[in-house]
Amino acid sequence: MGHGLDAGLLATVAIAAYRNSRRDDLDLPATLVAIHTALNAQFNGERFATAVLAELDLASGLLAWHCAGHPAPLLLRNGRAVKTLEGGRGLPLGVGVTPEIAEERLEPGDRILLFTDGVTDARSSDGEFFGLHRLTDLVA
């Protein structure tokens, strides 16, 4: 998404579309379409945003999600990273919309780690990437 005024405007449009979708009680696929449509209407396909949209049913523990050009979340269980939550992948919002939704049943105590590629792509002074392995070691 970037930084500065353009990024702020992009985020404002995306968040407003998300909030309107929630008020209208839209499901996850329809919410993705609404955000994509709002970004396209405002920016004519010249700007985009990555995101993870997710919904957790607390009664059943069912997590549904879609990664719109964003790194996949990590499932943390019993103090360790169990797996990357693959599936539900699509293009960044504003570029295209493929509202594929993935699901995973969570167990009590599970945690979901959402992060940006800015974390995993960070480099040390020696040029070494921080990477996904270090991130999971840090948080698990």
Each PLM stretch: what is its role?
Residues 1-6, 11, 15-140:
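Conserved subregion of the PPM/PP2C metallophosphatase catalytic domain
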